[in-house]
Amino acid sequence: IVRRYRTVDIMEENQLYVIIVSGRDDSCRDVTRKWLEDNYIPYDELHMRKTDDDRDDRIVKKEIFDAWIKDRYNVKFVLDDRNRVVEMWRSLGLKVLQVGEGDF
């Protein structure tokens, strides 16, 4: 049984360029790619924190955004679950769809 997420279908139907910014570090890159593949989540770019970088997700994701996304793309929306990261994205003026309870 193939399970697809409606949001993923909408992104594909509208030919959106999908950039994943993960809080996982590079040591998990292969496992993360496999998980994305197994869950039928297409993407165009995958950005992850450097191995052994244990800084707060807000800092890491903001740095990735500034370095790789901000001046290159017109971001339509962000999907995230962690409350404090959702707040960071919103503080940048981005529309955020919070995908789960994120008080962790």
Where are these predicted regions, by residue range?
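Short, acidic loop-to-helix structural element flanking the phosphoryl-transfer center
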Residues: 1-19, 26-33
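Anion (oxyanion) recognition and catalysis
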Residues: 12, 37, 90
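Short His-Asn-centered micro-motif
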Residues: 21-24, 79-81
